[in-house]
């Protein structure tokens, strides 16, 4: 057997040999890890790998970017850098039963007619984005909050089913792959066997093990954990000029392109026509759930036609054209030993069941939500009852039923408190609402704690380093009583906290100072107004353009805002009618909190104001995302479907049904050249 030391040749021949070995080993890796079809014996694979390692060690300048030797892990990182996604990585809405899915199907059918669905198992892992530039893996990132994730490129390179270079000749300049990292059952069991032998703490379930392994700062540890990856979608795809591309007209076709690129795709993907076939697929996968090599918590159902997906579009956090059809949660019986009442940020008083610990759905559960007084009455549950506990959506434990024949004689009624268990204020229940609330407002310490945590959180003011535990200590030590007090903190006060040295305190003070400059939408969201999430806060800011205008708006004015109904408008008006809330806002502004003014666009700057435009087909000179942004900057609303209210349709190459409908309705159509002239490129 010839070893690496016996290779003879010129420098250029050495380089060529390294390239040959790299390509050959990568082909064998795809055959083994992606196609489940080993092409050579293990001993021969090891010989090739040893040859490559030896040559790269002697000639490191010739190592290829997709060399399989990169998979063993490198130097440990100090932290993961944050990176922005090319387009948001959204979550999916859930269907928990057939009724939910039927409602989803009806919503789609009403908008775009009957559709073929593409179904696949819902892996219980971590969503990631892979970016290949000119075919080579450039970056990998976690989903994070959907807009910003963490750069895990080094760790992803250790996963053997992830190709470092895409296969084939017809590869676009930029390909973003969305998929799931998971730990197969066998790898999970082996990992826990090793931990048990060492006396280390065991991982609770494969998902936790995968999460902990993928986020190791030392990639050598990740490399040892036998993680796997399945691709489930394409993200941004662009040509050499940065124009967006659509690689196939169907989702199934796009998955086939991913397979051709050498990426692993679940073999359980199936096309389903109509409700009956979807339900049959769901039942089949549920039946085989425990036989699969990986854990799943449901199936994902997507509209197969890409143009129909584009017509359906998105809601704030999820696509309208896909849904996660969750499996029934695992259930167990246990005993309700008591009930505590917790107070949340908005004053909601929630009964929390204290349970005899029970192992269900991969975790030990000792608490479960009882939601509200109506739920307690519906269940007819008493302290001392034997109850059936379920992890709803395999995440949130809840009591779903009582076992009446096991009720003990000493069972006690659950009494909802008349006064807040934290501050003693009256507990009120507004007519028409199921939730009872503490009337104490920020006088209530529990509400104050949660309000300040929310104010400092990432999606709100984002004070880096101001986590929940820090806020808890600040309140316990009476250093902070309201959000404005956060901006009065200094190094000497912060060093009074546990595990807060001078350096950490200095960094936190700098983060507090940096957080003073924000945006009006983030500030509104940070205030914690009931029912005002990020999207509503952005709509309020866009509509009124100033805090003063929002403060002065009545319910009639507020319901003119996009997606704001009567209930939300009443919550907003009520919030700004409270003197204490206005005092908090004034104190924040006095502390230096500021944001750039939102200027009213001039009519000249927004000639398309009030018009609805639709994009269809492939735009070669600029991507669809850029075109949408340019049109919106000119005042247009860009919609996903054509209707009689559409003012104009921009038709790129391979325009489909939207163009046909526009022509049928007599709506003006602009080609790409006309669009470029309009936006002034």
UniProtKB/Swiss-Prot annotation:
Under which name does UniProt file this protein?
Answer: DNA ligase
Keywords (A to Z) from UniProt? DNA damage, DNA repair, DNA replication, Ligase, Magnesium, Manganese, Metal-binding, NAD, Zinc
Give the required cofactors: Mg(2+); Mn(2+)
Q: What does this protein do?
A: DNA ligase that catalyzes the formation of phosphodiester linkages between 5'-phosphoryl and 3'-hydroxyl groups in double-stranded DNA using NAD as a coenzyme and as the energy source for the reaction. It is essential for DNA replication and repair of damaged DNA.
What is a single Pfam family found in this protein's UniProt entry?
Answer: DNA_ligase_aden
GO MF annotations, alphabetized: DNA binding; DNA ligase (NAD+) activity; metal ion binding
Q: Where is the BRCT domain?
A: 603-681
Q: Which GO terms describe its biological process?
A: DNA repair; DNA replication
Binding-site list for Zn(2+): 420, 423, 438, 444
- Family statement drawn from the similarity comment of this UniProt entry: Belongs to the NAD-dependent DNA ligase family. LigA subfamily.
Alphabetical list of PANTHER family matching this protein = CHROMOSOME TRANSMISSION FIDELITY FACTOR 18, DNA LIGASE
Residues at which NAD(+) binds? 42-46, 91-92, 120, 143, 180, 302, 326
The protein's matches in InterPro entries, at most eight in alphabetical order, are given as: BRCT_dom, BRCT_dom_sf, DisA/LigA_HHH, DNA_ligase, DNA_ligase_AS, DNA_ligase_CS, DNAligase_adenylation, DNAligase_N
Q: Which gene encodes it?
A: ligA
* Source species of the chain: Shewanella amazonensis (strain ATCC BAA-1098 / SB2B)
